[in-house]
Amino acid sequence: FLPLLAGLAANFLPTIICKISYKC
């Protein structure tokens, strides 16, 4: 469960940073 969660975080984190900083 934890590796899956880490994988999800690794997938969504760049998108979140992109939306916050508007640097895509």
Swiss-Prot record:
Disulphide bridges, residue numbers: C18-C24
InterPro entries attached to this UniProt entry: Antimicrobial_frog_1 (IPR012520)
Taxonomy, superkingdom: Eukaryota
UniProt-listed GO biological process terms: defense response to bacterium
A Pfam family this chain is assigned to: Antimicrobial_1
Subunit structure: Monomer.
Protein name (Swiss-Prot/TrEMBL): Gaegurin-6
Protein species of origin: Glandirana rugosa (Japanese wrinkled frog)
Lineage of source species: Eukaryota, Metazoa, Chordata, Craniata, Vertebrata
Gene: GGN6
